[in-house]
Swiss-Prot record:
Stated family: Belongs to the universal ribosomal protein uL29 family.
Protein name, per record: Large ribosomal subunit protein uL29
Listed CDD domains: Ribosomal_L29_HIP
Keyword ATP-binding assigned: no
GO terms of biological process kind: translation
UniProt-listed InterPro entries: Ribosomal_protein_uL29, Ribosomal_uL29, Ribosomal_uL29_CS, Ribosomal_uL29_sf
Pfam family of the protein (one): Ribosomal_L29
Listed GO MF terms: structural constituent of ribosome
Disulfide bonds: none
A GO-annotated cellular component: cytosolic large ribosomal subunit
Keywords, comma-separated and alphabetical: Ribonucleoprotein, Ribosomal protein
SUPFAM superfamilies: Ribosomal protein L29 (L29p) (SSF46561)
UniProt keyword annotation of Magnesium present: no
């Protein structure tokens, strides 16, 4: 299974982006719990979730920086 593409994250709306970030954080928590109790069947899911979270947070940061530069603060 290939890693998710960042272009998919860039297509999300702001609200959906926040929802996805929350969902991936919950998924990572569950995966860490499974890893600690040695119940993790597919260890690659952990890497995919971390990769997806990094992509989503990158897109969120890009949008915040773009919004800050477009509206000058006085």
């Amino acid at each position: 299974m290939p890693l998710p593409k960042i272009s998919e994250a860039r297509e999300l709306s702001d609200e959906r982006l926040v929802e996805e970030i929350t969902a991936v954080k919950k998924q990572l928590f569950q995966l860490r719990l499974q890893k600690a109790t040695r119940q993790l069947d597919k260890p690659h899911q952990f890497r995919h979730a971390r990769h997806r979270l990094a992509q989503l947070l990158t897109v969120e940061g890009e949008r915040k920086r773009a919004a800050a530069t477009q509206s000058p603060q006085e």
